[in-house]
């Protein structure tokens, strides 16, 4: 019964979408990494993005105007990681805040002597546990250009990671995945990345396991060959986690 009601509600949202299929097609054409998707995959992505926009509010900060182009771009890229999962992976929070450019955010760090330092940092995005996703449009508008950097995917992958209670590079895995294998591969390659530079992989990923997972997820969707070249085992487990094969689709 609940499934029937859910399906009916979602179909009603899709039937009353403010954007047509042509609107979504034009939006997708502006995002290079979506070129690898076939027609059926694009249609599913459009449906997911429509449901996403119904479920999440997107508001501007510091006077930023959230246009349809902004909403479509954020929705399409946010939904790419869950294309073969479901919108339920983004449950438990409701808002996205867009700044025109990088913004200052309070930060707390603990040094090697255990002293706590309070300060602020300029950020291009962040994701809060059970809270909003915050993005800089100056950075987000260049996401999806197949250059290995995608702040939208980065922050929304943090949301997937947080489903286990905190961002630690260990999201809830698919039923057919081996948690021990995930831990072994991610831990081994994170340790390697802390001491060895890899072409096409942002050094920010060496910060901690959560950032490692998010940074490599960017590469998985943007420039998958770079990930295969650097860490083939991580590419393989991400294929199983995201249920997507971007390298095969791009060829």
What spans do the regions from the language model cover?
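Charged, compositionally biased N-terminal leader segments and the immediate start
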Residues: 1-22
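Active-site recognition of the HExxH zinc-binding catalytic motif
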Residues: 38, 147-163, 214
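Short amphipathic alpha-helical coiled-coil/interface segments
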Residues: 45, 49, 70-74, 78
